[in-house]
UniProtKB/Swiss-Prot annotation:
<feature type="transmembrane region" description="Helical">
    <location>
        <begin position="1192"/>
        <end position="1212"/>
    </location>
</feature>
<feature type="transmembrane region" description="Helical">
    <location>
        <begin position="1273"/>
        <end position="1293"/>
    </location>
</feature>
<feature type="transmembrane region" description="Helical">
    <location>
        <begin position="665"/>
        <end position="685"/>
    </location>
</feature>
<feature type="transmembrane region" description="Helical">
    <location>
        <begin position="1352"/>
        <end position="1372"/>
    </location>
</feature>
<keyword id="KW-0067">ATP-binding</keyword>
<comment type="function">
    <text>Pleiotropic ABC efflux transporter that shows a strong substrate specificity for the azole class of drugs such as lotrimazole (CLT), fluconazole (FLC), itraconazole (ITC), ketoconazole (KTC), posaconazole (POS), tebuconazole (TEBZ), and voriconazole (VRC). Is also able to transport rhodamine 6G (R-6G), a known substrate for many ABC transporters. Required for normal pathogenesis in a Galleria mellonella (greater wax moth) infection model.</text>
</comment>
<dbReference type="GO" id="GO:1990961">
    <property type="term" value="P:xenobiotic detoxification by transmembrane export across the plasma membrane"/>
</dbReference>
<feature type="glycosylation site" description="N-linked (GlcNAc...) asparagine">
    <location>
        <position position="137"/>
    </location>
</feature>
<protein>
    <recommendedName>
        <fullName>ABC multidrug transporter C</fullName>
    </recommendedName>
</protein>
<dbReference type="InterPro" id="IPR010929">
    <property type="entry name" value="PDR_CDR_ABC"/>
</dbReference>
<feature type="domain" description="ABC transporter 1">
    <location>
        <begin position="158"/>
        <end position="412"/>
    </location>
</feature>
<dbReference type="Pfam" id="PF14510">
    <property type="entry name" value="ABC_trans_N"/>
</dbReference>
<feature type="transmembrane region" description="Helical">
    <location>
        <begin position="1226"/>
        <end position="1246"/>
    </location>
</feature>
<dbReference type="Pfam" id="PF01061">
    <property type="entry name" value="ABC2_membrane"/>
</dbReference>
<comment type="similarity">
    <text>Belongs to the ABC transporter superfamily. ABCG family. PDR (TC 3.A.1.205) subfamily.</text>
</comment>
<dbReference type="InterPro" id="IPR003439">
    <property type="entry name" value="ABC_transporter-like_ATP-bd"/>
</dbReference>
<feature type="region of interest" description="Disordered">
    <location>
        <begin position="1"/>
        <end position="21"/>
    </location>
</feature>
Amino acid sequence: MSLLGTINPNINPERTVAGRGTQEEEGEIARVEHNHHNNAASVSTDETVLERSKEIGDEDVAVEEVTRLARQLTRQSTRFSTSGNVENPFLETKEDSTLNPLSPNFKAKNWMKNLLALSSRDPERYPKRVAGVAFKNLSVHGYGSPTDYQKDVFNSVLEVGTLVRRIMGTGKQKIQILRDFDGLVKSGEMLVVLGRPGSGCSTFLKTISGEMNGIYMDEKSYLNYQGISSKQMRKQFRGEAIYTAETDVHFPQLTVGDTLKFAALARAPRNRLPGVSREQYAVHMRDVVMAMLGLTHTMNTRVGNDFVRGVSGGERKRVSIAEATLSGSPLQCWDNSTRGLDSANALEFCKTLNLMTKYAGATVAVAIYQASQSAYDVFDKVTVLYEGRQIYFGRTDEAKEFFTNMGFECPERQTTADFLTSLTSPAERVVKPGFEGKVPQTPDEFVRAWKSSEAYAKLMREIEEYDREFPIGGESLNQFIESRRAMQAKNQRVKSPYTISVWQQIELCMIRGFQRLKGDSSLTMSQLIGNFIMALVIGSVFYNLPDDTSSFYARGALLFFAVLLNAFSSALEILTLYAQRPIVEKQARYAMYHPFAEAIASMLCDMPYKITNAIIFNLTLYFMTNLRREPGAFFVFLLFSFVTTLTMSMLFRTMAASSRTLSQALVPAAILILGLVIYTGFTIPTRNMLGWSRWMNYIDPIAYGFESLMVNEFHNRQFLCPDSAFVPSSGAYDSQPLAYRVCSTVGSVSGSRYVQGDDYLNQSFQYYKSHQWRNLGIMFGFMFFFMFTYLTATEYISESKSKGEVLLFRRGHAQPTGSHDVEKSPEVSSAAKTDEASSKEATGAIQRQEAIFQWKDVCYDIKIKGEPRRILDHVDGWVKPGTCTALMGVSGAGKTTLLDVLATRVTMGVVSGEMLVDGRPRDQSFQRKTGYVQQQDLHLHTTTVREALRFSALLRQPAHVPRQEKIDYVEEVIKLLGMESYADAVVGVPGEGLNVEQRKRLTIGVELAAKPQLLLFLDEPTSGLDSQTSWSILDLIDTLTKHGQAILCTIHQPSAMLFQRFDRLLFLAKGGKTVYFGEIGEKSSTLASYFERNGAPKLPPDANPAEWMLEVIGAAPGSHSDIDWPAVWRDSPERRAVHEHLDELKRTLSQKPIDPSKADPGSYDEFAAPFTIQLWECLLRVFSQYWRTPVYIYSKTALCVLTALYIGFSFFNAQNSAQGLQNQMFSIFMLMTIFGNLVQQIMPNFCTQRSLYEVRERPSKTYSWKAFMAANIIVELPWNTLMAFLIFVCWYYPIGLYRNAEPTDSVHERGALMFLLIWSFLLFTSTFAHMMIAGIELAETGGNLANLLFSLCLIFCGVLAPPQSLPGFWIFMYRVSPFTYLVSAMLSTGVSGTNAVCEPVEFLHFDPPSNMTCKDYMADYISTRGGYLENPSATSDCTFCTISSTDTFLSAVSSHYSDAWRNFGIMWAYIIFNIFAAVFIYWLARVPKGKRTKGST
C-alpha cells in the first residue's frame, strides 16, 4: 500500500522513529495502544517512563514515548487487523467519518493509522518500501567557463575560439560545489538543511535525490540508500528519490483536482486494497492529500500561472507539494518549498511531512531559508552548510549546544535555525566574551572543528553500523525490488522506474490532453475560426475560377497557397511544446510517465482539431474556387492536404524537441520554412532548379504534396483556350483558320482550341500522373521518420538548465573571481564582508530629509463586478525624518494598496482623505521626490549595477544639479550599500546573475540614487529572503534612518528580532481598517500594553510580538477573537491623540515659510530632466541593451543574411524568360516572408523594456512615455540600415538583377534605389511591429495579429493574384496593402528596360499561311503586341516568343519603373503612419489618464 512513501506495517524495530508530534497526538497513540495491550508489560513500561521523566527533560521523554509506542504498534500490528473497527476508507466511509477526506471531521492521523492497520493484515501483498540514505565523503563539482564575461555583439565573435576548445573537450574549468559531506538519515527521519542562499543547499538535495543535471559526484563519494547504490537508485528507481524545486510548474489550464488526480493515477500501485479500482484509489488519494494541505476548496479552480488566472501563489505552492506527495516516494527532498507560504502554513507543511515519516516510514530532507522555532522543532536532524562545506550534522536538539560550547552566543529571542545560519556570516555571528580568537572564522576552520568533534566521530560510527546493517546489494535491495514489483503493472519491465505500463501512460496523458483542451478551448477555437476566415479570404480572391487556360497560373498559385497553409498550420506547435517542456521533464523525473508517452498522447489529442481544421479549411477553399468538382478529386485533395499537415507537424515537433532553447529553434525553423516554400516546385519549377540545389526538392515533403495536388487538378482534363489567348489574334487574324494559330499557354498544340492538362503539367513542371500515389508513400515515409526522431528526441534531449547565480562582468571591467559554487559566487555573496568604515563614511553624502509626510482619514474605494468595495478605511499616520515605520497586517489587509495610494500610484478607483507634505498638499513632483522600493526586483537584465544607479540619478535628481555631481553621488550610494565588489556586475535575470540579496540592494540603491527629498517607501523588502539577508537589509534601513531618512516599510510576519528594529507600527486588519498606530516601545512594551489593556492575553516573554499580535486579533490560522479591534482603535484615546498631533502638524508646518535658498526652479515639474535628456539617456540604455543581447542581433543578422543568400542562390543568375521573370518576381515575394520572424524578434525586446518602464520607472516619474516610445522606435534604425545593406549584397547580386540595368546605363541609380526599398521594408517592419505591440500585453498575441495582417497584405499585393483578376470587392485591399507598392517598385527597379528571351519550352509553334514567311505573317501582331520570332524567314513551324521586353511582363502585373520613386515615397508615408499610430495606441491603451480623488491630497 503506498501513500507518500509506503504505509509500512513492518517498520524496522531497531531504528528510532522520527518526528515529535504534539502532546495530543502522543496521547491519542497511547490510548489506542492501551486499548490493545492492557497488560503488565505496558504498565511497567509506562512506570519506567514516568520514573525516567524525573531524570531527563520532557522533550526527550516525548521522543522515547513515541519511539516505544511505535515499536509496540509494529509488534502488535496483527491485533489491529483483527479489530472490528477498521474500515476500508476507499470504499466504506460515511459522510461525517474522520476517514472521509471530504468531511469537515477528517483527521489525517486517523486515516493513516487505519490504513496501517488494513495493510498489516497481509504483509506479503504490501511489502515495505523504505529508503534511508547514508553518505560519506560526498563531494560534487560542475564545469564552468574560466572567463565568463557578459557577451555583446563584438566579443561574441571572440567566443568562436572558446567554442572550438569546448568541442575539443578543453577550456572548461572544474568548479567544486560541495566538499566532503557525511551524514545519515534513516527511513522515518526528517532532516532540515540550513545555509545561506548559495551555500550548496539545492545542490546537496539534488545530489541525494539523484537529479544530477550538469553536476557530477567525485569518485570517492559514497552513497547508500539502505542497500541500494546511487547509480541503481538513479536509473532503476528514479521516482523513488525525488527533488522538488522551489519553482511551481503546472499546466495552467487544468484544475487543481485534475492535476492531482493525474499524479495519483500515474503512481497508482497494482497492490491496492481488494475491491479498489485505480480510479477509486486515485480519487481518494487526491482528496486525502488535498484535505491535508487545505486545498479541498480549490478542487475545480484552475491552477493558473503568471498569465492565466488561477489559484493564489501560496495555493499553487501547495499544489506542487501535493503533486510530489502523491508520487509516493520513500525519499523526498524539498528545496525551499515553504517560500511564498506564511509561517503558519509553513508549519503545517512541516507537520504533514512529520506524519508521513512517522506512519509511512518516508525519509525527508528539507531546505528552509526562514524557519520559525516551531517548524525547526518538527525535524529530527539538521545539517548546516557554509559555502559548500558541511559544518554540522546531527540531532536538532543538540545543534545549538554544539556551537554554544564552541564559544558562540545565541542572542535572546533568536530562533535556533537563525542562530545556526548566522554562524555562516562573519558580520552576524556573536562570540561569547573570553572566546575571541578561539572560535573558528573561515569555512575551513569550521570544518576542522566539526571533524575533530565527538559528535562527528559518533556520526561516523552510526554510518558504519548502518552500512553493516544494509550492505549495498544485500537483502534490503531485494525487499525494495519486491516492493516495487508489487506496485508495478503486470506487463511493466522489472527494471523500469515507472509504475504503470506504457499504454496506461499514453491513455492517462491523452485524458489530460483533452482536459487541457477543454480548460482552454479559446486558442483552438480562435485557430479554427482564423483558418476558416483565411479560407474565405483566399476563396474569394480566387472565386469561381473559369475552366479555361486563363486560370492555369491562378490554379497553380491557389494550390501552392493551399498546400502551404495546410503545411504550416502546425508551426505554432514549436511554441506550445516549449511551454509544456518543463512540466513533462519534472513529471518524468517523478517517474510518472515516459516523455515519449506524453508526446504520443499530444499527437493523438491534436488529431480531432487537425481533422476538423482540414475539413473546414479545405472544403471552403475547394468549392469556392471551382477546383475540380468531382467527388474523387475532392477526397484526394483532402487526403493529400491532411497528410501534408501531419508530416509537417512531425517535422516541427522534431525541431522543437531536438533544440534546448526556443531561440535555438526559431532561426533554423525560419530558414527551413523558406527552403520548403522555395523548393515546393511553384516559385521555381523543377526544370528551373539549379543542378546543385535540385536535391532540396527531393527532401521537401511539401513538394510531393504539391505535385500530387496539381496532378489531381489537371490530369485527364482539357481546358478551352479563350479567343484572346490565341497567337496571333485580333483584327484580320481572327478570321484565319485554327491551323495557323495557337493557344499561348505552355502545352498547347497548333490548330487545337483545347490544352491538355497533362501536357501543361509535363512541360511546365515535369509532373506526371504516375507519381501521384508514389508521392503519398514518400510522404508517409517522411511522416514516420520525423515521428521517430521526435519521440526519440523527446525522450533523451532535455531543456537547457540555468547556470545559477554566478556573477558576470562586462569585459575589461572586472576579472571574475573563480567561484566554487554553481549556485552563487561566495566571494560576493554578502555585503557583510564589505568595509563598514567606508559605508559609514558614505552616509555623510546621503540626502538628508527634513519634510514630514502625514495622512488623515485616507479611504480608497473601487468597483469590483459593479459593486463598490472599500479597500482602505479611514487610515491615519505620519512619517518623520530619521524614523522607520512598519506597516503590518494580515494578507489582503491593503498594506501595498496603502503604499500605492500614499505614493500616488493608483490609477483607478476613488481616493479620499488628506495627504500633506510639511502641511501642504502634494504637487505633481511628489512621485519623483519619493523613493518607492517595490517588492519585485525589476531591473533591465543587460545593465550593470553602476549603470542602473546612474540612470536613476541622471534622470530623477533635479536638473540644476551638475551631471558630474550626480555621478559622484552614485559612487557614494554604492559605498553605502556595500556594493563595490559587484558594482560592475551585470544584473542578469533572476536565477542567473545577481542573487536575491544583491538584487534587493540594487532596488533600494536605484531609489536612493534619485536623492528622494521627501521619504522612502519599501514594500516587503525582506519577502522571499533568508533570515540573514533580511537582517542585513534591516541593517541598511537602520543606517538610512540614522541619517535622517524617513521610511515607511511593509513587512510580512517578521521575526521577534527584526520587529524590534522598527520605531513605529501601523497595523491594519481586513478591509484596510486600522488596529493600531503608534510607538512599538522597548521589547514591544508600548504595543503590548495597548493590546493587553483592551482585553488581549499577556505577551509571553519568549513569544514573537508580530505573531502574537495576529493571534490576538484572530488573523492567524486557527485563532479567533471576539473583540472588534478596529472599533476598539476608533474609540481609543490613542487615536484621539494621533488626530490631535496631525492637526498640530498641519497648523505649524503650513505656516512655516519655504526657504528661498533651497527653492529649485524645476521643483514642481512632473519630470526632473528635460525631454531631450530623457530621450538621450533612454536611447543610450536601449542601444546598450541591444548591443549586449548578441543573441537578438545575431539572430536578426542570421535571419536576414541566410534568407537573402538562400533566395539569392536559389534564383542564381535568373534568366529573363517568361518563367525567369516570374521567378524574379517570386524572389522579391519570398524576401517579404522574413517579416513575421523579424516581428517575433522585435516584440519580446519591447515588452521587456515596457514592463520595466510601466511597473517601476513610470510611477516614479523617471522619464515620460514619449521618450520611452521614441527611444524604442529609433534604436531599430541603425540595425535595420545594417541589415538592409547585408540583404542587398547577399540577394541583389546573386540573382543578377544589376545586369538588367546595364542596357539603360542605370546600374548605380537602380542599385541605390533597390537598397533604399529594402531599407524602407525593414523600417516598415520594425515600426509596424511597434504599432501592433504598443497596446497589447503579450508578445505572442501581438505577433499573431501582425502575422495575420501581413498575410492579408501579401495575398493582395498583386503577385499571387494580379489586380485585374481580383473580385471588385477586394480591389481596395490591393490599394491599401503597402506591399503592393513595395513589390511593384522592387520588381520594376530590378527587371525593367531590358530584353526578354524565351526558354525552349515557352516558344509557340504554328505554321504560317502558304506562300508567307513567318515574319510576313506576324509583322502586324508583333508591332501591336510585341514578341519576337526565332526563325523569321521560315515558311513553316514558326517559333514565336510572346514577350520581347521585360516591360511587357511588368505591365501585365501593373508595375512600371516610372512609379518606383513614387512608391518609395508611399512606403515612407506608411512608416510615418506606423510611428504616429504606435504612439497614439500606446497613449490610448496604456497611459494612465488620471484618477478621481476627493478631499485634499
